[in-house]
Structure formats: C-alpha cells, structure tokens
UniProtKB/Swiss-Prot annotation:
Source organism of this protein record: Halothermothrix orenii (strain H 168 / OCM 544 / DSM 9562)
GO terms assigned for molecular function: deoxyribonuclease IV (phage-T4-induced) activity; DNA binding; DNA-(apurinic or apyrimidinic site) endonuclease activity; phosphoric diester hydrolase activity; zinc ion binding
GO biological process annotation, one example: base-excision repair
E.C. number: 3.1.21.2
UniProt KW keywords: DNA damage, DNA repair, Endonuclease, Hydrolase, Metal-binding, Nuclease, Zinc
Sequence positions that bind Zn(2+) 1: 66, 106, 142
Protein name: Probable endonuclease 4
Amino acid sequence: MRLGKHVSIAGGLYKATDRATKIGCNALQIFVKNPRGWKIKEVSDSEIKKLKDNIKKENMYPLVVHSSYLINMATPRDELWEKSVNSLKKEYKRTELINADYFVVHPGSHTGKGLHFGINRIIEAINSVFGEVKNGPQLLLENVAGAGSSIGSNFTELRDIINKVDDYARIGVCLDTCHAFAAGYDLRYEDGLEELLNDFDKIIGLDLLKVIHLNDSKYGLASNKDEHAHIGEGEIGEKGISNIINHPLLKDKPFILETPKFSGRDKDVELVNLLRRD
C-alpha cells in the first residue's frame, strides 16, 4: 500500500521526506512554496539533490505537489487570473525540477460569472501552463466540496475540462473523499462507494484516477463544506474509510492523508494501516 501525508517543507524541501518516514509513510505530498503568498523563493541545487536522494533512499512514491491556495484558474478577474497562471507555471516548473510525480490543482471558482465561462477559463490556464512547460508531470484536477460557485464538485465538470486540454496525456484526477462526501456521495456505505466509482468510470474513466486524498469529513453528507477530520472521527467513519482503501479498484492507488496534525505519533497513518486488508 502506498500511503502518504501532506507534510511541511519548513527548513528545506528535503526535510519533508524525514517527516514522512518518521510517521510511517512511503509516499508524501508537499507545497513547493509558501501556499499563502505569490512569491516563490529560489531553491539551491544541493537542496533539490538532497530531496531526490532521500526519495530514492526511502523508496518513496509518489511525490505529490499541491498547488498554493491563492490560485483561481476560473476567476473572471483578469489580474487574479494572470497571477494564478504565472504562479501555476512557476510551481509546475519546480514540480518538474524535483522530479515529482503529480501536481494537484483545484479547478477554481467562477464567482458568479457562470459555469461555462469558468470552465473555459480553466482550460485556457492549463493550456498556457502546458504550452510553456513542455515535459512536466501529470496535472491532477481535484474534485471539490461544491460550495458557492466552485467548479469540480461533479465529475461532468471535470470531464468537460479534461476533454479540451491540449495535452491529454498530462491530465488526470485526484479524488478527495471528504469533498466527494460533501458533494453527495455517501461513502459511509458500500453502495455509495460503488455509485461514485461507477459514475467516475462512466464519465471520466478510472484510468485517469491517479491519487486519492484520503480524508474523513467533519460535516455531514451533501453539506458542501470542506473540513477534514481525523480518520474514523468524522462522518464517513472507520467502516467507510475501510471500504475505500480495500476496494479492488482502489487498493493499489496511492493514498495521501490531509488530516489535521498530531503532535507525536500519527494515529491516522496507524489506523489506515490497521484497516488495510492485504
């Protein structure tokens, strides 16, 4: 089982691997910059080499990069859209530089301008990134909880973006379990999970599902609220999480936890390993 967690890069990118292995992970997710700002600091060749060496030494896979928080590919505000695209390009270049496997991005919000407008704006943004960075890793669109005018809470919206991206080989999906539950898929039960997988396969295709963000949900079914809970302590619960990680179509996918931090041992990592049936 490939199980990782989103970990801090404080003190250097390469220190993320130490944090991941310390809590029992063999995969990881990071930001490549401060996620709450536009600036991106330079990183030295030695820092990048240390990260690559650590990844190889610990046999960690995949290395997933998550885009920063301020990016909105769907915004009608030209200045924000330009900033978003420029930041995406810089982060995507760094993702390529460190040999990361995937780059996860939230589609964004059209803020009232309309779904059609927002989707076209997202397509334009991704094509601009791919046009400048020719050999980067797969960019994964993440499903969202469905609050407000956000795009990507249903698979049809994600498909409409994917089908019009110029470089189809470089696009995929990251499925967030908390977001799917918040958007209406009842992952507490096997029937709800089967419904999700059937819809995903019919609309997008399971071959494009590359990474799963394994998160419990603080809020109830179809709440459209995005707040992650510790595994087994949220509304999806242990049984629901167990169904997900042991499903024949999902068990070989990489799982990344984005649950709240623990001060010591990571009980989420431990519980997921206990729930896994080999």
